[in-house]
Amino acid sequence: MITFRGDGLYNSKFDDIYFNTNEPLIECEHTYSSVLDEINAKFIVVAEAGFGTGLNFFSTVLKFLSLNSTELHYIAVEKYPFKKSELREIYLKFEILKPFFDEFIEQYEILDGALIRIKLLNERVILDLYFGDILDAFDELSFRADAWYLDGFSPTKNPDMWSKEVFDRLSKFCKNRAKVRTFSSAKIVQNRFLEHGFSIKKLKGHYKKREILEASLEHSSPKILKEPWYALPNISKFSDVLIIGAGVAGLAAAFKFKKAGFNVCIAEKMSEAATNGSSNLAGILMPLITKPKVALGNMHMSAFLFARHFYANSPFADFCGVYDYGVNDLEKTRLSLWDSEIFKFENDFEPYPRAFIKSAAQIRPKELCMSLASEFDIKYGYEFESIEKSTGGYVVKFKNSKNIFSSLVIFAMGDVSTNLFQNVFADEFMQLSSVRGQVTHLNKVLNLNSAFSARGYMCKDVRGIQVVGATYDRNDNRSAARATDDEKNIDSLSEFITNLDVKVVGSNVGFRGYSGDRFPIVGAVHNASEFKKIYKSLLWTKHSKNNEFAVHHENILISSAHGSRGLGTAIFGAEILLDIALNRPVCTTNSILNSLNPARFLVRKLKRGLVR
């Protein structure tokens, strides 16, 4: 589909070129990124329909670095993405972009119907890249841009890109006084802008292009949310953050908020960090692979891809790859349906077909948490008791009779979050439970180059110990290790370690929070009492355009119920909370964000008329 022809990179599907080979970067700046000269803002949001090769993005990065702005947030949509190998070939011709491209391509993966986030230049540049149709992107994303680039081939070659339906939505994703640049100056494009409230002017084109278009929108259009009960909160101004819980979820959030410039205090009920589900010697960072485009699978894949960047330079991460075995027909089918560069499927392998996830990693959670904890003055022995609204924030009371004031509070309490919703936030419909998991420490049994997951999982050895696991016992609060559980863990790997000298040298028990639908609980804490009032008729009004927006407990967030894949989702959740707190575009789709929303169980009951 993609070839170099004459003076440009050619796409046979659209019978059109991506860019001219004659000074392509200069052309990109002239046509698109020069619009940044007209934007006087420290935080710039640029959106692009038609990411293509990414050349406009890199041109915008270069332009951004020449300005006094502090952060560039670039949101792009691409329906027909290039593979990694294709992009590497293309960018051999752009030596000036090599430092940016190398950082970009390490994080780039194609995930159809989903969003990936890529960070460059110590997070000064954020790229959110959605793979899919532009109209689907309008449903799945929430942002307003200072500038838009419409670069989806010419109207005659790609009419869907320039349809009335696209322009009907465009103004709802623009800030006041937003600018829109297009390479095409066709009459149909001019008319589309004028019909939708934009003013237009023609600018001189570059090289052989006579003219381009710039459209301006003085006043953006209001958005109508399809599901206003999942509306994001309005976070009040804050400077300090209290995080309750010092496991992976709490410490990841602390790390991100501290890096963003906030004063962070951590309160932990135990005498050290990572005493619960985060306490294992070793664990695996890998996605849950479902059938393609399944919401749960997309969420886990998005979380996995994002978390890799967090762990990239960590001494506690070994990017050794992970084998995921399809131990039954259902799992084999799931693995075989993907056409992805993320993993390679081997159908004829014994004892089971397997996928090799090259960029998966083995993590040492306990050591990771202790290292992160050393960066904070953590208040140990602080077990949460209650929270009270106060002027400018909250007074949080602990069972040791101590109080902490903070203007923003994040709960990351793992499996005890059930009590939080029942006793503090009055949501009796929250589906959260505690699950006991025991892992077993073996003497080094197998000389592994990569960890693997089958009926159970086995890690590479850490200082002569191999971690295998794990049991799953809901509502079992016994903290002592059990020999019978060690036997279960060993039996779950019997097809791999039969006739080997297996010795149990230790065990570890942890308790994890799980939700009723297997998605984590991440987002703003809803005001359940207000929900029950304003949505009491939701059974009949759920399709109405007049429903009120969600009401939240001001400046209270949560990250919980990360289950057995918290090494990925806890990092993902921390980024989501930071996005919400900063009121910036969120790192995932609306579908996934709604699936994580703490109010979702209450909303489902309200929709069915089951709340009195």
From Swiss-Prot:
Its cofactor is FAD. Residues 1-218 are annotated as: tRNA (mnm(5)s(2)U34)-methyltransferase. It comes from the Bacteria. The keyword tRNA processing applies. It is found in: Cytoplasm. One of its GO terms (molecular function) is tRNA (5-methylaminomethyl-2-thiouridylate)(34)-methyltransferase activity. InterPro entries: FAD-dep_OxRdtase, FAD/NAD-bd_sf, MnmC-like_methylTransf, SAM-dependent_MTases_sf, tRNA_MAMT_biosynth_bifunc_MnmC, tRNA_MNMC2, tRNA_S-uridine_synth_MnmC_C. Gene3D superfamilies: D-Amino Acid Oxidase, subunit A, domain 2 (3.30.9.10), FAD/NAD(P)-binding domain (3.50.50.60), Vaccinia Virus protein VP39 (3.40.50.150). Keywords: Cytoplasm, FAD, Flavoprotein, Methyltransferase, Multifunctional enzyme, Oxidoreductase, S-adenosyl-L-methionine, Transferase, tRNA processing. One of its GO terms (cellular component) is cytoplasm. GO terms for biological process: methylation; tRNA processing. Disulfide bonds: none annotated. It catalyses: 5-aminomethyl-2-thiouridine(34) in tRNA + S-adenosyl-L-methionine = 5-methylaminomethyl-2-thiouridine(34) in tRNA + S-adenosyl-L-homocysteine + H(+). Its EC number is 2.1.1.61, 1.5.-.-. Residues 244-612 are annotated as: FAD-dependent cmnm(5)s(2)U34 oxidoreductase. Catalyzes the last two steps in the biosynthesis of 5-methylaminomethyl-2-thiouridine (mnm(5)s(2)U) at the wobble position (U34) in tRNA. Catalyzes the FAD-dependent demodification of cmnm(5)s(2)U34 to nm(5)s(2)U34, followed by the transfer of a methyl group from S-adenosyl-L-methionine to nm(5)s(2)U34, to form mnm(5)s(2)U34. In the N-terminal section; belongs to the methyltransferase superfamily. tRNA (mnm(5)s(2)U34)-methyltransferase family. This is tRNA 5-methylaminomethyl-2-thiouridine biosynthesis bifunctional protein MnmC. It comes from Campylobacter fetus subsp. fetus (strain 82-40).
